[in-house]
Design a protein with these regions (language model features):
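Bacterial N-terminal signal peptides that target proteins for export
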Residues: 1-11
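Solvent-exposed strand-loop boundary residues in beta-sheet-rich modules
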Residues: 115, 127-129, 178
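N-terminal signal peptide c-region/cleavage motif recognized by signal peptidases
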Residues: 18-21
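Predominantly extracellular/luminal cell-surface or secreted proteins
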Residues: 96-98, 122-126
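Contiguous segments within soluble domain cores/interaction surfaces
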Residues: 117-121
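Solvent-exposed adhesion/ligand-recognition segments of exported proteins
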Residues: 105, 128-135
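N-terminal small/polar-rich segments of proteins
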Residues: 23-109, 113, 137-178
């Protein structure tokens, strides 16, 4: 009898071990997540690194005998130029050369009619036209807090004798550093 009890006990012990071996096992670990953000800016609501539209300076329509014509650089929405950069950056706008700089006395820049006529003009950082924005002039903005900043750029064209009617244009390069 004792042998029978031992065999039954041994069998039960074996079953217990077998069922323990088949029981689910839990292991633990972790997933590492990451995201790398780089500083960026938007100009008038658009991002990118080349070909951005910094706005348009429209002097309007005047007769060919005008003395001065004033305008302001307007962004895409009709307001002033808008710069939105990552928090912690200090953006600066560099207004580079135009296509016709120095081609007409009376201004550092010039609008061209595509034939042989130029209208001189200059850019300014104030509406009163007292703070000249020279070629390669830099406008440094406040440190960004993630809120769009307004950049005001004004222009004043100067009339001169002998200008024929027509459309006069110029293209100015602009750089945004942040």
């Amino acid at each position: 009898m004792r042998t029978l009890v031992s065999r039954i006990g041994l069998s039960l012990f074996g079953l217990t071990l077998a069922s323990s071996a088949m029981a689910a096992t839990t292991v633990t670990g972790q997933i590492t997540s990451s995201l790398t953000l780089i500083s960026s800016c938007q100009v008038n609501g658009s991002g990118g690194s080349t070909g951005l539209n910094f706005g348009a300076l429209n002097f309007g329509t005047a007769n060919s005998l005008f003395t001065t014509a004033n305008g302001q650089v307007l962004g895409g929405g009709g307001g002033a130029l808008s710069i939105l950069c990552s928090s912690g950056t200090t953006p600066s706008v560099k207004v580079r050369a135009g296509a016709n700089d120095g081609k007409s006395p009376g201004g550092s820049r010039a609008l061209y009619d595509g034939v042989a006529n130029y209208v001189p003009y200059d850019l300014y950082t104030d509406a009163g036209h007292s703070q000249l924005l020279a070629i390669d002039g830099v406008i440094t903005l406040a440190a960004s807090t993630g809120v769009a900043q307004t950049v005001n750029i004004y222009g004043q064209a100067v009339g001169k004798a002998g200008l024929p009617a027509g459309t006069y244009t110029d293209t100015i390069a602009v750089e945004l550093t942040f």
